[in-house]
Amino acid sequence: MSNKEFALKKHEEWAGKISVESRCPLKTREDLAVAYTPGVAEPCLKIAENKDLSYLYTRRSNLVAVVTDGSAVLGLGDIGPEAGMPVMEGKCVLFKQFGGVDAFPICIRSHDVDEIVNTVALLAGSFG
């Protein structure tokens, strides 16, 4: 099997390089009541009073976006956002493995700089 065939096989097997997993236990009704409703209301109300508390009560302090429009992907050129996703996932894995930072790929279907900047600005409340 060639390196290219092996890479395709592994990417198909993995079906993506990253996943989202829970950091809190959800084994009992009490766990659910604390992590979701009604307990989730308390940090929401505190953050509503002071948005900086979102860094304390959420994963925002350790979550970054890896953003691309797919126009300049690792020497592959303009391959588009969907085709750039494997590279963005790979970058997210590097953030986690070598820096302990949770990263999430955002692949935008636009080459318009203003649209990209606006999209990132609109998403900023989710990332640190």
Q: Where do the language-model regions lie?
A:
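N-terminal ligand-binding/catalytic initiation module
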Residues: 1-128
